[in-house]
Amino acid sequence: MLTAQQILSSKKCGDLFSSADKQVVIAEYREIARAYHPDISSDPQANEVMAKVNQLYEEALKLIESGAWEVSNRLILRDKLGKKYIGKYLKQFPFELGEAYIANSTVTYVFKENHKRFFDNAASQIKGLRYANKKMEEEMSRFMPRILYALSLDDGRFCLVLNKPEDVFLLSDIKDFFGGSLPDRHVAWIMSRLSNLCCYFSYTGIAHNGLTLQNCFICPSKHSILPLGGWWYAQRIGEKMLGVPSAVYDIMPIKAKSEKLSDIITDLESTKLIGRQLSDISSLPKPFQSFLYSCS
């Protein structure tokens, strides 16, 4: 049985009723009414709850008749051939080129209509990742994004659906969970893993150009970093940049900023910015503080 607060926070019929089957909806409606009807319930929110239940119940019956159904946090995409892609997500947030959706095992980036070149670049850069040998591939590929779908949508937008292990979390969410700053020992291993990623990017001849709290995911149990987002900015070192997030632009080397050429130094400076954003700087050892504020 849902709590009063859960019922009041329901936005779609599928948030309240477990099925689009009419008999199930009727049975669940009666069960809720037995618990929250103002004539028999002592809950102070009973009137408000039943008003919400009645509203969603009426909407549910209409949707069932029309063959439709609604559930919150459900992403429905349709490609240009008419094929539907449906999935539930845990978190939605905007990024500079569109909307992102995080689910248990995927992260989906939906690009606005006018950002096709960024969508194309992300797909190309991810597919073009290379490794010196099998050992390097086994070590590094588990941290790199893997494309499940790259879609041109029927509404003119573009969509990348990437694989995401279930035990990884957005780095900005981890920061929020810790109240704005992580314990020093966690910042230390995060910086170590980010530095390893920069070494790999340098080997492959690219700069990621989008390493931020919103584009990096971490697996706390395995002490690993996965740069799943931001690949739309990646570019061969020395080639013309497509752009960078505003936070990265603020700390870019002057040369890279003026020449607008991709440079691994941008990634190195981005990792230090992440370290500063995650830290209570005053609690860090002096050498670590000096490193985070040094120039690469």
Give the location of each predicted region:
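Activation segment signature within eukaryotic-like protein kinase domains
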Residues: I190-M191
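Catalytic-loop of the protein kinase fold
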Residues: C198-P220, L228
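Juxta-kinase regulatory segment immediately upstream of eukaryotic protein kinase catalytic domains
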Residues: S66-K88
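N-terminal J-domain/J-like co-chaperone modules of DnaJ/Hsp40 proteins
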Residues: M1-I40, K52-E65
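C-lobe/activation-segment region of protein kinase-like
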Residues: S224-S296
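ATP-binding glycine-rich loop module of kinase domains
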Residues: Q92-R146
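Conserved structural core of kinase catalytic domains
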Residues: M144-R185
